Amino acid sequence: MTKSELIEILARRQAHLKSDDVDLAVKSLLEMMGQALSDGDRIEIRGFGSFSLHYRPPRLGRNPKTGESVALPGKHVPHFKPGKELRERVSSVVPVDMSDTTD
């Protein structure tokens, strides 16, 4: 699901709200979450999960074109840990066998 699809679905489900208001709410929420993470804060949404930053230490990488070793600096990356309710909901989904698909 894309952000546009999410906005469209929410606008349909909340018919009393204007589509522009739903668009603004979703974009504001995502902006605030991004800002909180960039400030080093943790975001916890009970039943859904939590967003935090994990530190990746410096490491030695490799340039795929030349095979040359390259020093990569340490960095913080966003991390999502699903909550219990979300994990249980997702685990009940029957997995799709991708080997049966034909193009």
Swiss-Prot record:
A molecular function GO annotation: structural constituent of chromatin
One example of a Gene Ontology biological process annotation: DNA recombination
Keyword DNA damage applies: no
Keywords: DNA recombination, DNA-binding, Transcription, Transcription regulation, Translation regulation
Cellular compartments per GO CC: chromosome; cytosol
Presence of keyword DNA-binding: yes
Region feature Disordered, mapped onto this chain: 59-82
Function: This protein is one of the two subunits of integration host factor, a specific DNA-binding protein that functions in genetic recombination as well as in transcriptional and translational control.
Family recorded in the similarity comment: Belongs to the bacterial histone-like protein family.
HAMAP family: IHF_beta
NCBIfam families: hip, PRK00199.1
Subunit structure as annotated in this protein's UniProt entry: Heterodimer of an alpha and a beta chain.
Protein name per its UniProtKB record: Integration host factor subunit beta
Organism of provenance: Xanthomonas oryzae pv. oryzae (strain PXO99A)
Gene symbol of the encoding locus: ihfB
